[in-house]
């Protein structure tokens, strides 16, 4: 395999140890340095020269201890060299093609992280660590390249270096078009002209390409003197790879410029964003070690509500073609909160000193939103019947519950029986008008619920903590950078850097899967005989994916280490 040959060459480079080379400018920079390049604290005479051991390039001044402790990557700390290999949509599709080719013992132990048998986030073969660029830039390559092109063609270094003709360059600085469903066998590659436009139809999108896209395909065919569809196919793939390289390298450059971190050392954008946040805020969060406190907070994490309260609406007003003046004028409104995640994350948030305390309800309710101390409470709530009609469209205090027949109206039961539907065995987050028992929530939510008419019938537990707006520095930084952004690529990037952190603040490690890829029959037999064995998917006689029950769970999120 050519990629394995390339791996050997890269390993030789990474294992090299080049002496430091300093220019006169480097020497002057080092002499005038006042802060460590690693910890950013003052040097105060404790200054050594840090350099890249691969290139020999001087990187900056640092404390002696910081320089000794620094490792290029987490893998290097374990003396393991990993070479990142990026695919766009590796998790959802492309990864399957590669995995099915790993059915040989020569590839050794294959390390992987998977969500399930269909979605492989990353897997490592020898030193090659396969990653999904879509987990960082969750848009189509077409949109990503279009956004980047707003800044100019100089952003596409890889593409420009491989294509010298300017007219050809202009054609390739965008996502190409391809007749996916027309290519059904290798004989099609011998055809000497593009298929008609209707053959570019996509069942997934339920449409064909536009006339301008088809003209673009013809221009590419003619300008590159393509002889058959096979050559068109190869150029299409080459262009995709070059554009992805340009897009991701620009993403890396932006990340390093603003956060001094390289995304290639992370699995997903949320992983990267969390470390970027820790660098910006320098926050040290308390790590919960009391299981009762941890489980109480877990109980309050319910997810987001997704529901339809009004199933069908029609507008009738003078701006519509079918306006009926004899009927009442009505409008449909679409409402969206700007920077909702950002606003939520600049509030006072739990930070440290989590302790169970004895507090009166009145004392909790009188605590200001921006007080130095906050509370998570466990209460019984009564939902007065006189509020049911008023709150029916959007009840307060939603709950995770399995919906049974007793929870359905007569109309819903009739509909269920007519359609022969079965009750779901999976819990859903359901807004309802029932009373609540041992309901866990933040004290600001409790104040809101009581203001709207709910009643606390019993206060069970109170978890007090020190709070501050410790995320505000990071959120404001990204918001300001987004306002200064010169193109859509950067605007989307800084928005994602805020939103990605939100999910990491409430990551549920219990949901992590333990899936292994086995290409050794003896190893599979040994694993399948263990009590933790759960299930497997057989790819062929030499390759199987095995899922195991987790024997331990490390409750270590969120953390600031």
Listing of model-derived features with the role each one plays in the protein:
Residues 1-561:
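Metal-dependent nucleotidyl/phosphoryl-transfer cores and adjacent nucleic-acid-binding surfaces
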């Amino acid at each position: 395999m050519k990629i394995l040959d390339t791996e050997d060459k890269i390993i030789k480079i990474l294992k090299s140890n080049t002496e430091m080379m300093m220019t006169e400018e480097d020497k002057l920079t080092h002499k005038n340095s006042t802060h460590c390049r690693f910890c950013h604290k003052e040097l105060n005479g404790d200054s050594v020269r840090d350099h890249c051991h691969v290139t020999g390039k001087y990187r900056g001044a640092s404390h002696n201890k910081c320089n000794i402790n620094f490792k290029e990557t987490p893998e290097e700390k374990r003396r393991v060299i990993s070479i990142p290999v990026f695919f766009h949509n590796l998790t959802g599709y492309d990864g399957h093609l590669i995995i099915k080719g790993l059915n040989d013992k020569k590839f050794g132990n294959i390390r992987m992280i998977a969500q399930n048998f269909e979605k492989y986030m990353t897997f490592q073969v020898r030193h090659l660590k396969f990653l999904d660029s879509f987990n960082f830039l969750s848009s189509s390559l077409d949109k990503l390249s279009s956004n980047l092109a707003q800044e100019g063609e100089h952003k596409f270094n890889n593409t420009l270096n491989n294509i010298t003709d300017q007219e050809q360059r202009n054609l390739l600085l965008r996502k190409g078009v391809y007749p996916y469903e027309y290519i059904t066998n290798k004989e099609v590659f011998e055809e000497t002209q593009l298929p008609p436009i209707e053959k570019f139809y996509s069942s997934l999108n339920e449409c064909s390409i536009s006339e301008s896209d088809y003209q673009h395909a013809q221009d590419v065919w003619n300008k590159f003197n393509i002889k058959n569809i096979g050559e068109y196919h190869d150029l299409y793939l080459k262009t995709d790879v070059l554009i992805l390289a340009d897009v991701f390298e620009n993403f890396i450059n932006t990340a390093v410029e603003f956060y001094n971190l390289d995304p290639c050392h992370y699995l997903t954008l949320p992983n990267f964003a969390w470390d970027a946040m820790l660098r910006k805020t320098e926050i040290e969060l308390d790590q919960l070690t009391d299981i009762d406190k941890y489980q109480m907070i877990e109980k309050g994490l319910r997810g987001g509500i997704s529901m339809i309260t009004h199933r069908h609406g029609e507008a009738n007003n003078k701006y519509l073609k079918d306006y009926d003046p004899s009927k009442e004028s009505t409008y449909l409104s679409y409402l969206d909160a700007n920077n909702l995640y950002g606003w939520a994350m600049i509030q006072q948030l739990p930070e440290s000193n989590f302790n169970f305390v004895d507090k009166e309800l009145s004392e909790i309710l009188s605590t200001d939103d921006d007080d130095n101390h906050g509370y998570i409470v466990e209460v019984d709530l009564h939902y007065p019947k006189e509020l049911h009609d008023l709150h029916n469209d959007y009840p307060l205090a939603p709950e995770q519950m399995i919906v049974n027949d007793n929870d359905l109206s007569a109309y819903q039961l009739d509909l269920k029986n007519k359609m022969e539907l079965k009750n779901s065995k999976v819990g859903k987050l359901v807004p309802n008008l029932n009373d609540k028992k041992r309901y866990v929530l933040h004290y600001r939510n409790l104040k809101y619920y009581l203001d709207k008419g709910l009643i606390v019938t019993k206060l069970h537990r109170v978890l007090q903590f020190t709070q501050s707006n410790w995320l505000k520095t990071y959120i404001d930084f990204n918001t300001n950078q987004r306002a200064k952004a010169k193109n859509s690529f950067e605007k989307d990037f800084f928005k994602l850097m805020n939103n990605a952190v939100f999910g990491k603040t409430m990551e549920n490690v219990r949901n992590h899967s333990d899936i292994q890829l086995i290409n050794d029959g003896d190893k599979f037999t040994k694993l399948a005989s263990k009590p933790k064995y759960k299930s497997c998917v057989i790819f062929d006689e030499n390759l199987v994916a095995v899922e195991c029950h987790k024997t331990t769970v490390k409750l270590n999120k969120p953390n600031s280490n």
